[in-house]
Amino acid sequence: MVAKGRIIRVTGPLVVADGMKGAKMYEVVRVGELGLIGEIIRLEGDKAVIQVYEETAGVRPGEPVIGTGSSLSVELGPGLLTSIYDGIQRPLEVIREKTGDFIARGVTAPALPRDKKWHFIPKVKVGDKVVGGDIIGEVPETSIITHKIMVPPGIEGEIVEIAEEGEYTIEEVIAKVKTPSGEIKELKMYQRWPVRVKRPYKEKLPPEVPLITGQRVIDTFFPQAKGGTAAIPGPFGSGKCVDGDTLVLTKEFGLIKIKDLYKILDGKGKKTVNGNEEWTELERPITLYGYKDGKIVEIKATHVYKGFSAGMIEIRTRTGRKIKVTPIHKLFTGRVTKNGLEIREVMAKDLKKGDRIIVAKKIDGGERVKLNIRVEQKRGKKIRIPDVLDEKLAEFLGYLIADGTLKPRTVAIYNNDESLLRRANELANELFNIEGKIVKGRTVKALLIHSKALVEFFSKLGVPRNKKARTWKVPKELLISEPEVVKAFIKAYIMCDGYYDENKGEIEIVTASEEAAYGFSYLLAKLGIYAIIREKIIGDKVYYRVVISGESNLEKLGIERVGRGYTSYDIVPVEVEELYNALGRPYAELKRAGIEIHNYLSGENMSYEMFRKFAKFVGMEEIAENHLTHVLFDEIVEIRYISEGQEVYDVTTETHNFIGGNMPTLLHNTVTQHQLAKWSDAQVVIYIGCGERGNEMTDVLEEFPKLKDPKTGKPLMERTVLIANTSNMPVAAREASIYTGITIAEYFRDMGYDVALMADSTSRWAEALREISGRLEEMPGEEGYPAYLASKLAEFYERAGRVVTLGSDYRVGSVSVIGAVSPPGGDFSEPVVQNTLRVVKVFWALDADLARRRHFPAINWLTSYSLYVDAVKDWWHKNVDPEWKAMRDKAMELLQKESELQEIVRIVGPDALPERERAILLVARMLREDYLQQDAFDEVDTYCPPEKQVTMMRVLLNFYDKTMEAISRGVPLEEIAKLPVREEIGRMKFEPDVGKIKALIDKTNEQFEELFKKYGA
């Protein structure tokens, strides 16, 4: 009999109901009129305390609570792989089709598709005896993974019926088992399992087989075992954020600093505060501009975010852009290849001088902006007030801002070109129904229009009354206007205050207003014109030069230039040789079209104008005329790290990028986990995003499907299950997502697969436990976390393991758990980290200092540890090299000795050290740079097989031994440092042939022998 009760209290995600007699602990219930999904977590008499996995806003006392009689369970069967679920295993793609982009409350959908037919291949026959865990059939679920249909635990007997090979849905009965009691059990292709209950196994095996990841610092120094547990700290402080002074182009507020935008929108919706981070889900999304389908168009921003970053990266580009972002903020780079325009997202910390980042060249859209300006008109002739910003008003505005001023009762425009003043007067008559008077002063002519109302009108339109030269900025209305309106303003401004250098073929505008210069670059982008901005100091004041060059840019302003139109700013990175070969090398045809292909094959940069011609030959007109009219590849000329901590900001947009910066730049809204997911020799990957911010989770959902499985070349998603639980979802769902993920992992383990589960982040789960505990009024433990925090974390990690599975045949499967922890401010002493470290056996400590020095993976070898080294050494000794452990320990000793010596060097300098100790510093540096440092983006070095890892280590340690021998025989260290083999050792990581790496040992020995002879040692 199901329990039926009534709500008596609602406190956030917790609901208390009475009349729940007969209910059970951890029973799933439907709460309120909407039937929200909840779980009973406490029973007191007939009162039940329920944690609700959906938003409880609007749920009131008196509404019903109905039990389901079952505990929170997951469906396990074909259809799990490639799926994206929320914390309670609702398929997000299916729900999106039902309710749109936002999950409506009370909506459910089956976790596995009911109508899809799977190809079932039976593996037993009638009369066979089976027990729980036996495989009765197989389904090729994806091209990588075969799904094994198992007898559920607790069922045994004789097969009395088995389906023939064919297509079946998961609801069809595929087998019948007669139990010893005579009962017939019907088996389908899926089973349900309660998430809080461990799936059973025969025997737990010691974790003595390493989980090979191909990352040298992990496999050799801090190995993870199959069935083992590891923790890795997530990125501290902020995510992919920008400096508060970064300009953002918005429809509602014009060009505005992101920190000012945050102040305006802070709390205008659902606000969340989490330590030094806070964000608001906007009640009314605002309009920004972003890159979508090859164009820069209007997009919606749904969240604003403020956080803190311990350091920033400042980038300056050739055109004058200044970009200040967090080290892990992604910018865009790209190249044109035979496959089209390939855009890559690169973290700011991974960029270097000379790289080209994608910036905005053309911003699409615009409208006839309606003006709602009211001015007071008391006496005299009333002027007409325009109600729309059109070309004529924009032109007048250009004259006024360039050469005019607002006096208390007069609008004045100064210029010695009387025809220009007459044109402005003509416009004043047409627009405002008022005429001015042209007068001649001592040095300059002026158009004076006497009207206090007109002064007020322009003041409200954004023209400053005082110190205009230094304070003016482009009016918001102009920034969102149509291109023709923008063009009218720019041409008028240039006529007054621009200088055209016919020899250079460029227009220069000089302004004392920084905001005006940057606003100009955004206006020019509305016309598809890119600007170059330079600062110049006159006296003690800074002025800004806005330069427009290039034939096509000038043409867009109606200025013809005679002569060559090449500009070295608008360069297109092109794989010329690849495209030329694909074309069949038509040299003569290209030459007739004016394309000297050999110049570009020799390395000359191809301008955009030249690429437009080339594109016609290679069938890439769409790229030339669409994508590349909208973006520019801007070269980085300076990049530096700023170590001061500061507040940082971000916005969440539908395109996951937005246009911002001092000049229009494309800004993005993690590699270690991607490397583990791609390269670890686990067959199945489960990723749990537990309480992640929406934009971070979006990154994962977008990036994982793009990753290729390196072993098969197929999408990595074909062996992956994603569980997405974002920070703005109810906190109770974080716990459900953790248990859902581990249960799915155990299910694949039972098939005999090795599973890697990544939980990101367990810290946010712990925060949810703290909130629920507080609402339950439980006695708090350290820092407000519940007293049972340690046991909850241990319970989760203990479900990892390498086991002999249930079933008649011998199968071994494993679940390896890698949990991310996100300590506030990187504080490893806080309770979640400390309790995690008591349970896990591996800790990979990410080091921001290493990341700044571009050392990846940025795992600190002095603070990381692995307790599996002794457990996995037998596997390494038997399968790879019997000296693995001895070499690993010797290398660790060297690195630790280096750390001690560096302390001495800081005090007395390196020259005070004896030769032997300086030699240790030399070899330890080689060990760091040539072994520990690994390039995730290099085709060879991204994955290093065990045999290659050991061979590289042997080469380095042999060099160390020979160095020590040479020092003892009187050879100067400077001579050792100059040995040619050192350079070859530095390149060995990029060599796929292990035999060639091994040959470096003999080469090292030979070169040292020559040194010994030279010094008579």
Swiss-Prot record:
What is the predominant subcellular site recorded for this chain? membrane
Q: Which Gene3D superfamilies match?
A: 2.40.30.20, 2.40.50.100, Bovine Mitochondrial F1-atpase, Atp Synthase Beta Chain, Chain D, domain 3 (1.10.1140.10), Hedgehog/Intein (Hint) domain (2.170.16.10), Homing endonucleases (3.10.28.10), P-loop containing nucleotide triphosphate hydrolases (3.40.50.300)
Q: EC number(s) of the enzyme?
A: 7.1.2.2
Looking at the UniProt record for this protein, which Gene Ontology cellular component terms does it annotate, in alphabetical order?
plasma membrane
Organism superkingdom: Archaea
Q: What does the record give under GO molecular function?
A: ATP binding; endonuclease activity; proton-transporting ATP synthase activity, rotational mechanism; proton-transporting ATPase activity, rotational mechanism
Q: Explain the post-translational modification.
A: This protein undergoes a protein self splicing that involves a post-translational excision of the VDE intervening region (intein) followed by peptide ligation.
Tell me what reaction this enzyme catalyses: ATP + H2O + 4 H(+)(in) = ADP + phosphate + 5 H(+)(out)
Topology relative to the lipid bilayer, per the entry, is:
Peripheral membrane protein
Q: What CDD domains does the entry give?
A: ATP-synt_V_A-type_alpha_C, ATP-synt_V_A-type_alpha_N, Hint, V_A-ATPase_A
| Alphabetical UniProt keywords | ATP synthesis, ATP-binding, Autocatalytic cleavage, Cell membrane, Hydrogen ion transport, Ion transport, Membrane, Nucleotide-binding, Protein splicing, Translocase, Transport
Q: Where in the cell is it found?
A: Cell membrane
**What general EC class does the enzyme of this chain belong to?**
translocase
The Gene Ontology biological process terms listed for this entry are: intein-mediated protein splicing; proton motive force-driven plasma membrane ATP synthesis
Ranges of residues in domain DOD-type homing endonuclease:
396-529
Please list which residues make up the signal peptide: none
Describe its function.
Answer: Component of the A-type ATP synthase that produces ATP from ADP in the presence of a proton gradient across the membrane. The A chain is the catalytic subunit.
| Quaternary structure note | Has multiple subunits with at least A(3), B(3), C, D, E, F, H, I and proteolipid K(x).
- Miscellaneous field: The intein interrupts the ATP-binding site.
Entry's NCBIfam families?
A: intein_Cterm (TIGR01443), intein_Nterm (TIGR01445), PRK04192.1 (NF003220), PRK14698.1 (NF011287)
Q: Which protein family is named in the record?
A: Belongs to the ATPase alpha/beta chains family.
Name this polypeptide is given: A-type ATP synthase subunit A
Q: Which organism is it from?
A: Pyrococcus abyssi (strain GE5 / Orsay)
- Chain's gene name: atpA
